[in-house]
């Protein structure tokens, strides 16, 4: 199974693609989309949409996983991220791809074993789980790979539960 993970944002959108087979994870690719920072939001969103469509058509994922925005103190930032998230959902939907959204705490828990894991811990776990020499750069791409790994972990857990094999 090929999973596209997306870390949405209006300034940088990270994406990462992994392949899973027999519980083994293989890195397929990763990068980021960086719309012009001076462009108005609608143009940035169009840039992100076009870029994600190109990624989907190039890598042909089976499923898409997207990080959901976290609204702590900066509501304006969360709303902007939500717009980029909506564009990611639209790109996947227009390609008939199943999409799952994950909260930052869920991603941290699934990847590092703790919903309170630091960004550095998550990035190191991404490096270890994908058997990489270095942490993927930019950070947004490493975060997107964490989203994809989270989705793989959640799917594996759901499969175990659905089969009734809790031993």
From Swiss-Prot:
Stored InterPro entries: RNaseH-like_sf, RNaseH_sf, X-over_junc_endoDNase_Mg_BS, X-over_junc_endoDNase_RuvC
Main localization (coarse): cytoplasm
Named cofactor requirement(s): Mg(2+)
Enzyme Commission number, as recorded: 3.1.21.10
Residues noted as binding Mg(2+) 2 in the record, renumbered to the chain: 67
Sample GO molecular function, one term: crossover junction DNA endonuclease activity
Active site: 7, 67, 140
Positions of Mg(2+) 1 binding: 7, 140
Transmembrane region(s): none
NCBIfam families the record matches: PRK00039.2-1 (NF000711), ruvC (TIGR00228)
Protein name: Crossover junction endodeoxyribonuclease RuvC
The organism's taxonomic lineage, starting at the top: Bacteria, Bacillati, Chloroflexota, Dehalococcoidia, Dehalococcoidales
């Amino acid at each position: 199974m090929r999973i596209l993970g997306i870390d949405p944002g209006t300034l940088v959108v990270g994406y990462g693609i992994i392949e899973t087979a027999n519980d083994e994870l293989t890195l397929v690719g990763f990068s980021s989309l960086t719309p012009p920072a001076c462009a108005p939001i609608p143009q940035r969103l169009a840039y992100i949409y076009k870029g994600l469509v190109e990624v989907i058509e190039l890598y042909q994922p089976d499923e898409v996983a997207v990080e959901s925005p976290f609204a702590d103190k900066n509501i304006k930032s969360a709303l902007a991220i939500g717009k980029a998230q909506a564009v990611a959902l639209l790109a996947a939907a227009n390609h008939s791809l199943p999409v799952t959204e994950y909260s930052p705490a869920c991603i941290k828990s699934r990847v590092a074993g703790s919903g309170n894991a630091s960004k550095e811990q998550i990035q190191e776990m991404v490096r270890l789980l994908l058997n990489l020499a270095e942490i993927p750069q930019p950070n947004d791409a490493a975060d997107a790979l964490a989203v994809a790994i989270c989705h793989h972990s959640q799917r594996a857990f759901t499969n175990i539960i659905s089969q009734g094999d809790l031993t």
